[in-house]
């Protein structure tokens, strides 16, 4: 079984034909054309595999798009206007922790070996730093949706790749590469075109989403350094179970400081939406977990090239959906900037996969694709 480097998942092995039976060998030696007993099954096997992959991709798109749309609806000033993204994000961490634990219990192959457990000191050092940065990344990105459009948010989050490249060089995970620098500059130009002509530009929202993108790049570097080589966090479910308790604590403390417990308790949303608030608290965390699970399945079943292409299509679908449902306005220059950025991302991924350290490239590309809408 081949092991995926970022999530250490076992990919399905490629088809390898079994040795020919003696009867078939004799037929070949005698000039008789053998009839393959497996031949009728091959098209059916191929079709089944394609159907499974398509269903996984659709599930990934569904959960990702629904999560983005729901977060925008919850936090937008013109919609629900629930002004507590940090508190709500902390609740989502508890939901994801519960689902992660249930998955580990239900599927023993995801259970880590007890001898590989973190010591408490190691846990707070390794997981604590990653959880703090990840929690801030998610909290700030959710907070930005209060004031900026979903399409603008998605375009800004596409800049994650720039910061992944920057921090990979700073932390000496990757050697400096002039070609990659040129590609990231092209992507930066595309982001500038998207941002400079935004018709509903709000500086505070822009700063929040860009800060979350910077933290996402830092999060990638810290994850490479502190977590991925540890056997206890060898798959996304044990990683979630390790990180979410600390992420909950960090986000809760941040919510108490910046949003205030009294304002949270006395929010008019509790009276206005009543029992629906339980949906607001539980559903986003559930969607986030199943998005991670579908990503995991996609990584198992496909190549990194397929994942990269699907990730770019996901960005386009999210932006189209935001223009249809939330009536976001895109000017021609926005679209030009978006095309430049997405093409730059495609070229970057292709270069990283075909040149240099292939294992590190696959880890980086997977992270970028799966976290643009985190």
UniProtKB/Swiss-Prot annotation:
Repressor listed as a keyword: no
Disulfide-bond pairs as recorded: none
GO molecular function, one term: antiporter activity
Main location: membrane
Transmembrane region(s): 50-70, 151-171, 175-195, 201-221, 238-258, 273-293, 329-349
A biological process term (GO) from this entry: UDP-glucose transmembrane transport
InterPro entries, per the entry: Sugar_P_trans_dom, TPT_transporter
Keywords: Membrane, Sugar transport, Transmembrane, Transmembrane helix, Transport
Keyword rRNA processing belongs to the record: no
Annotated compartments: Membrane
Membrane topology of this protein: Multi-pass membrane protein
Annotated GO CC locations: cis-Golgi network; endoplasmic reticulum-Golgi intermediate compartment; Golgi apparatus; Golgi membrane
Family from the record: Belongs to the TPT transporter family. SLC35C subfamily.
Entry protein name: Uncharacterized transporter C22E12.01
Record organism: Schizosaccharomyces pombe (strain 972 / ATCC 24843) (Fission yeast)
Lineage start: Eukaryota, Fungi, Dikarya, Ascomycota, Taphrinomycotina
């Amino acid at each position: 079984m081949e092991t995926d480097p970022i999530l250490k998942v076992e990919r399905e092995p490629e088809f390898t034909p079994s040795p020919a039976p003696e009867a078939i060998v004799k037929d070949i030696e005698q000039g008789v054309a053998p009839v393959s007993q497996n031949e009728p099954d091959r098209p059916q096997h191929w079709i089944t595999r394609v159907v499974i992959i398509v269903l996984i991709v659709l599930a990934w798109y569904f959960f990702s798009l629904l999560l983005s749309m729901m977060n925008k609806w919850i936090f937008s000033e013109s919609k629900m206007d629930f002004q507590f993204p940090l508190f709500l994000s902390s609740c989502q961490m508890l939901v994801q922790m519960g689902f992660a634990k249930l998955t580990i219990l239900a599927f023993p192959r995801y259970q880590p070996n007890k001898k590989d457990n973190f010591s408490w000191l190691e846990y707070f050092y390794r997981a604590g730093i990653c959880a703090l940065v990840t929690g801030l990344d998610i909290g700030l990105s959710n907070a930005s949706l209060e004031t900026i459009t979903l399409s603008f948010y998605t375009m800004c989050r596409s800049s994650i790749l720039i910061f992944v490249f920057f921090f990979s060089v700073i932390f000496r995970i990757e050697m400096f590469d002039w070609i990659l620098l040129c590609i990231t500059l092209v992507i930066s130009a595309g982001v500038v075109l998207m941002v400079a002509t935004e018709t509903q530009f709000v500086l505070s929202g822009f700063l929040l989403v860009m800060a979350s993108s910077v933290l996402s790049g830092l999060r990638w570097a810290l994850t490479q350094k502190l977590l991925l080589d540890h056997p206890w966090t060898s798959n996304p479910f044990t990683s979630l179970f390790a990180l979410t308790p600390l992420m909950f604590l960090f986000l809760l403390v941040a919510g108490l400081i910046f949003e205030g417990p009294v304002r949270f308790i006395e929010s008019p949303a509790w009276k206005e939406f009543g029992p629906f608030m339980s949906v607001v608290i539980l559903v986003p965390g559930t969607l986030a977990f199943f998005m991670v699970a579908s990503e995991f399945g996609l990584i198992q079943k496909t190549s990194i090239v397929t994942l990269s292409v699907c990730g770019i299509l996901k960005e386009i679908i999210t932006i189209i959906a935001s223009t249809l449902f939330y009536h976001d306005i895109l000017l021609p220059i926005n679209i030009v900037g978006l095309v430049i950025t997405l093409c730059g991302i495609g070229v970057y991924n292709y270069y990283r996969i075909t040149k240099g350290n292939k294992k590190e490239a696959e880890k980086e590309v997977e992270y970028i694709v799966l976290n643009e809408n985190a």
